[in-house]
Amino acid sequence: MGEKLDKDSILYKKRHSIAHVMAEAVLELFPNTKIAIGPPIKDGFYYDFDFEKHISEDDLLLIEHKMREILKTGSPFIREVITREQALVLFKDEPYKIDLIQNFDVTDEITIYKSHKFTDLCRGPHVDNMNKLDPKAFKLTSIAGAYWRGNERNKMLSRIYGTLWNNEKDLKAYLKLQEEIKKRDHRKLGRELNLFSVHDEIGPGLIFFHPHGARIRALIENFWREEHFKNGYDILFTPHIGKSWLWETSGHLDFYKESMFEKIEMDRSDYYVKPMNCPFHIAIYNTDKHSYRDLPFRWAELGTVYRYEKIGAIHGTMRVRGFTQDDAHIICTYEQVNFEVREVLRFAIDMWNKFGFTNLKAYLSTKPEKAVGDDDDWQMAVKVLEKALIDFNIDFDIDEGGGAFYGPKIDLKIIDSLGRAWQMTTIQFDFNLPVRFKMTYTAEDGKEKRPFMIHRALLGSIERFFGILVEHYGGAFPVWLAPLQVVIIPVNSIVEEYALEVLSRFQNEGIRIKFDNYYNMRMNAKIRQYQSKKVPYMFIIGEREVVEGKISIRTRTNEQINGLELKEALEFVKLKISNKEIL
């Protein structure tokens, strides 16, 4: 589930076809509605409508019922090619269709599909007839707002989402998965576990990390730094803003301006907050002259960048306007490229394994039609990337012509505990910026040469990765990442002295531990409370534990471990942390 569908696949055709059936049902139930577009998408389909009156999710069952009535007709889906003039007449009362037609290229073939009483402007493809659509295998799932053509200056339409599968069994499996996804939604758990918040009155897409969330983030970042030092990287810190000439030179103002925040005018100069870290790292490189003996440079930064995401695209910590990229740039010679790419891929695999992600999938994107750089360099880079994937036994697909105009790349996806693929690591050659910024080094023969530059992000963005971690573990983080690892729960005040001794011993060993001496709550209620907060271990201390000098442990998974010596309990927890174990 969740993989992108090929247009020729039967499921793609079914989803496209059911979207037309939904549009017909809506028009029968709400006759003055104007229709926009209705494509198949990952896991389902949608259609955008301009309703005369407000509708809600309460209307979805009514629409579903009408759709099933239409399906009973078994009507065919008939494709016709028409002229531009015919299309303008046919859809004269549909302003959104007219807008589409008027923006077609004059050479475009215009096709329509007819089914039952409905005709739509559509390229297809579709199933042959409605008998191919199982009436028990689809469900309308939600309604959301969507701007026409995705432009916030246009009217907001009502987008009805649905899902369709080959049979009822697959539908039920999908809906069950969606229920689990809802339970694990990082926005929901973020509130329940007090991890982070968003304040639209301050600014949409800007994340406020609360103490527990900030603790997890700090643990991620500290681990990231330690691993980079172990792997021969140097850490950089660069500014958040730069003058316009920098972004003109890099090409961002020519090709990326729509995703950048507006300029800031001061001191008779224009500044922009940075959308990427690359030009700043190059500025550091160009501070000095370099010899081939100096290379490679492996420079990494947890650099905060800012991108003007549309309001409708913002989503929790996953899609934001201010975020921290775990960027690195490797600057090296031709002879060093093969080793450096292999090392980056090895580092990425190791990093993901330590965070609990062992199922990886890669995509290798090659040279597009329009590209900069030498053909030989492109061929070499693609071969190096492909060989690294093969050597590390990573399953990969080749996206022919799918590379950026400035270089080929590997995109590495992780598969989470719910089977969803998340694009995370990128290893990207850049044949553009070294030329734009005139980067050079002195080769062994004394001549000036252009270095190779490899962009590299492992986690992608810290904020997005944080959200993925929350959902992957359902908030029940591995012990090493848990913001609170242990809670001591004494049964009464009589045993507090021993409980405080345990607290001190564990604190001195760096364990994140809390002492709960609130006695107005029953013991079982306390345990349930901390289990709901996903705390890994609760130390229950009663009079027996005091007499024997031992500890009883209740885990968040409700496992009971009795009679551990204090030293044993300490070693038990420390081992779980050092091994990065998952409960």
UniProtKB/Swiss-Prot annotation:
Pfam families: HGTP_anticodon (PF03129), tRNA-synt_2b (PF00587), tRNA_SAD (PF07973). Its cofactor is Zn(2+). Keywords: Aminoacyl-tRNA synthetase, ATP-binding, Cytoplasm, Ligase, Metal-binding, Nucleotide-binding, Protein biosynthesis, RNA-binding, tRNA-binding, Zinc. One of its GO terms (cellular component) is cytoplasm. It is found in: Cytoplasm. It catalyses: tRNA(Thr) + L-threonine + ATP = L-threonyl-tRNA(Thr) + AMP + diphosphate + H(+). Its EC number is 6.1.1.3. SMART domains: tRNA_SAD (SM00863). GO terms for molecular function: ATP binding; metal ion binding; threonine-tRNA ligase activity; tRNA binding. PROSITE patterns: AA_TRNA_LIGASE_II. Residues 185-478 are annotated as: Catalytic. Transmembrane segments: none annotated. GO terms for biological process: threonyl-tRNA aminoacylation. Its main location: cytoplasm. It is an enzyme of class 6 (ligase). Zn(2+) binds at residues 278, 329, 455. Binds 1 zinc ion per subunit. Catalyzes the attachment of threonine to tRNA(Thr) in a two-step reaction: L-threonine is first activated by ATP to form Thr-AMP and then transferred to the acceptor end of tRNA(Thr). Also edits incorrectly charged L-seryl-tRNA(Thr). Homodimer. Belongs to the class-II aminoacyl-tRNA synthetase family. This is Threonine--tRNA ligase. It comes from Borrelia recurrentis (strain A1).
